[in-house]
Amino acid sequence: MRWAAALLLLLAIPRRAPAMAQDWNSDSALALARRAIEHRSHAAVDTALRDYRAQAHGFLFFLGQFGEGLSEPPRLVKADQLELEVYWKAPGLSKQRIIGWRDRAELPTDISYHRDHLGIVQNNFGRALRLGEGDEVRDVPHPLAPGGTDVYDFALGDTSAIVLPTRAVRVVALRVRPKHFAAAAIVGTLFVDIESAQLVRMAFNFTPKAYLDPQLEDVSIVLDNALLEERYWLPYRQEIEIRRRATWLDVPARGIIRGRWEIDSYQFNLDLPDSLFRGEEIVAAPKPVRDSFPWRAP
């Protein structure tokens, strides 16, 4: 298995000036978007990748800001560290099992995370985006889902090169925004492999209409993929930040959840049984198993 470690050494090679407003929905931008949509729609037909197993290493930080104006820096309230077994099977089955979990509280808290905060994003969210088990964000159209060009505008950005031992992969930034900002949608940048039209990176926020919880201020997400077997762009690193306004003892407060994940140790085509994927996507091993996980560092 070869990792695209050079993903960390992204070398910008300017091909054009940054896209201006008049570049939205140019022929070349829409052509690339449609190629990416087509690839995602038919990815399951690629029988070379039937399934995989991987390991995910994650941290969740809960921070708080307190007081009028919320001008003080956030304070760490609680930190959680998690280890997961990650499974995927074509066309889009996902299972994650928490095998290690430890936490430390710096301040009193009774926070309880949504189940999907405890794992990674598979399939780059699929056709629609959902967070907080549907309580925070639900049914937001993915810009690279079928019909994405009817919902979103696209504009080309700069082209970059990811230098691998055997070749260089050209990646182009594809900016995305909704045609109607009053709709539930995302705003951000997609990075697409020009040759294969696979999604390499997503960095985005949501429009206000997407937030179902009225206390939500902002959600920002970055999904980085790595090139494996010189063919498949699969989850490599992910970050999420959720900011929510509230009150604490009648004092204005802001709660911030920050999640950071790294995914590695991929094994391919293990003939995983369908029974493995039954039930909830994210499950936890028994507590004695989680408590006995051999952490690498104190």
Question: How should each PLM-predicted stretch be described?
Answer:
Residues Q198-R201, N205:
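Surface-exposed extracellular loop regions of Gram-negative outer-membrane beta-barrel proteins
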Residues L11-P18:
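C-terminal segment of classical bacterial N-terminal signal peptides
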Residues M20-V187, P208-L212, D218, I242-P298:
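Structured extracytoplasmic
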Residues W3-L11:
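Sec-dependent N-terminal signal peptides
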Residues M202, Y236-I240:
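Beta-strand-dense domains in secreted/periplasmic systems and polymorphic toxin scaffolds
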Residues S41, G188-L190, I194, S220-E230:
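Extended lipid/amphipathic-ligand handling interfaces
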